Amino acid sequence: MLRLGHRPQRDKRVTTHVALVARAFGAKGIYIHGNDQKLAKKIEDVINVWGGKYFRIEMISNPKKLVNDWKATGGKVVHLTMYGINLPHVQEKLKELDKILVIVGAEKVEGWYYHMADFNVAISNQPHSEVASLALFLDRVYKGEELNIMFGDSKISVIPMERGKKVVRNDGQH
C-alpha cells in the first residue's frame, strides 16, 4: 500500500495507524511518501514483538514512479477516496485481482492519482478516516480471512477471552 503525502509532524499518529492496520489486516507492506525514520522504527518495533516480518516499510520520494512501475509490471492501483465508486459496487472485481497497490492520502491528492488508478473506491461518499477506509477495504477484499492471521514469528500473543486480558510470551512463559 502507498501512503501519500505523509507529513511527519502532522500525520505521524494517523500514518502509524494506517501502517498498523495494513500489517494486521494482511497487506505485504507499506510505502510512505516522505522520510520519517521515527515512524519506520515504531512499525519495525511492532513487527519485532508482534510478528509479521514479511511486512515491509519503505520511505519513498517519488510516488508517481512507484505507481507507474507498479502498473508496468501488471499490478492494479486502487485509490481509496470518498469521491470513488462505493466499495459494494466493485468489491467482486477487486477480489479477483492479484497484485494491488492501495493508495490512501494524507493531504489533498493530486488529480494524477485519480486518473492513474484502475479503481477509485469509496468507503461511503462521506468524509471519514483513511484508517477506517483501509480496514474496511482489506476486510472486503480478504473476505474476513485477515481476522484469522497468525503471526508465527511473534514474541507475544493475545489469548482471546470473554473477560479479562491474557498475553503470553511465545517462549511458553507468561
Curated annotation (Swiss-Prot):
Alphabetized Gene3D superfamilies for the sequence: 3.40.1280.10
Can you state which reaction this protein catalyses? cytidine(56) in tRNA + S-adenosyl-L-methionine = 2'-O-methylcytidine(56) in tRNA + S-adenosyl-L-homocysteine + H(+)
> Per UniProt, what is one Pfam family of this protein?
Trm56
Q: Does the keyword Hydrolase apply?
A: no
Name the Gene Ontology biological process terms.
Answer: tRNA nucleoside ribose methylation
Subcellular localization? Cytoplasm
Enzyme Commission (EC) number: 2.1.1.206
Which positions, given as ranges, span the membrane? none
- Keywords carried by this UniProt record: Cytoplasm, Methyltransferase, S-adenosyl-L-methionine, Transferase, tRNA processing
| Cited HAMAP family | tRNA_methyltr_aTrm56 (MF_00077)
Q: What is this protein for, i.e. what is its function?
A: Specifically catalyzes the AdoMet-dependent 2'-O-ribose methylation of cytidine at position 56 in tRNAs.
Task: Please state which protein family the record places this protein in.
Answer: Belongs to the aTrm56 family.
Q: What is this protein called?
A: tRNA (cytidine(56)-2'-O)-methyltransferase
* Record lineage: Archaea, Thermoproteota, Thermoprotei, Sulfolobales, Sulfolobaceae
